[in-house]
């Protein structure tokens, strides 16, 4: 996969950071020593962790060299490691694993989530936020355009669902707090929606296409967005963006 673009990702930095702020506010820990930020990206979520626990040893993990470089530049007091979340092993048990908008990219959550819980200290916390927009028009239309243009399905899998995650984490020995929030982001245009998803959800669909194929894909995608995202009275567009939040505290 081609590398992530930190500048494009940070174009909507405030909107992307807000769920991390709200997830962190629900973490029931006072003092922590060892923290991992899984899928840390350019370090915007890591900065929140460092602000709350400045004395903690915080390690950001990301598979993107560009994102890791950006994070290291922004936060020299934190450690950053280029690695696959599924294979990374901490040097010691963790007090907090924080994963903001990262685990949705990985398969087999029935194995992944218990594995992450096993990396925690007793009373340690796994805090997760994942976009839950597989059935939103933004993502449905990606699949429809791909089908029209004879491209294979390259999108991520849908999330397992609230009840499944509750059972997975309860059986792994956790107390579970789980909720879902839909944000309505004010967007100035359909092109702004495309700019948003190009940095994330559209990446798998576009990465192997030629420049001309990408343009055809995006032109058709823009046309279909016009049907699903009408203008408000003031000319803005409301982009519904559901997100699933989980705070699981290890009790065993």
Swiss-Prot record:
Catalytic activity: trans-aconitate + S-adenosyl-L-methionine = (E)-3-(methoxycarbonyl)pent-2-enedioate + S-adenosyl-L-homocysteine
Enzyme Commission identifier(s): 2.1.1.144
Record lineage: Bacteria, Pseudomonadati, Pseudomonadota, Gammaproteobacteria, Enterobacterales
Subcellular location: Cytoplasm
Enzyme class, spelled out: transferase
Protein name (database record): Trans-aconitate 2-methyltransferase
Gene it is expressed from: tam
One Gene Ontology biological process: methylation
Keywords, ordered alphabetically: Cytoplasm, Methyltransferase, S-adenosyl-L-methionine, Transferase
Function: Catalyzes the S-adenosylmethionine monomethyl esterification of trans-aconitate.
Pfam families cross-referenced by the UniProt entry: Methyltransf_25
Coiled coil stretches, renumbered: none
Sequence similarity: Belongs to the methyltransferase superfamily. Tam family.
One GO cellular component, as annotated: cytoplasm
GO molecular function annotations of the record: trans-aconitate 2-methyltransferase activity
